[in-house]
Amino acid sequence: MTTHVKIHGYHIDVFQHVNNARYLEFYEADRWEWMNKRNFINWAIKNNLTMAAVNINVNYIQGVLLGDELTVVTRMDKIGSKSAVCYQQIIRNNAGGSEVVSDAYVTFVFIDNITNKAIVIDDELREKLALFKSGTDDFIQN
């Protein structure tokens, strides 16, 4: 999935750059687009499941400034028995080319909304998650 963000004044903090907390918003926005594009949210609701982030590991590589144009990309990295991990990048696009300004690994589980407990990732859910492994052409190799 790909989300485009142009940095405006409301993204900037008192130090004239994008605060680290904003990166999390950009990452989450792309994950929502990622799930919406594949109708995953409706499927999860129908199956009484909630996707919950349990760990986010973010690397801040370069600062982001007013006027920067960013692309956020997401792909599934690993599917385990009870959790899965997606990999994300924020890429700055400028006249000189593109560069990664941040990357992140997000680990998440699925909660059964009836029992309020994490579930084992069964074959059906694994198939749905495997669809998110495609579309990695926009990534920049680190």
Residue ranges and their predicted role:
Residues 1-3, 60, 64-66, 77-142:
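HotDog/MaoC-like acyl-thioester-processing domains
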Residues 34-84, 99-102:
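Hydrophobic beta-strand-centered segment that forms part of the acyl-chain substrate-binding groove
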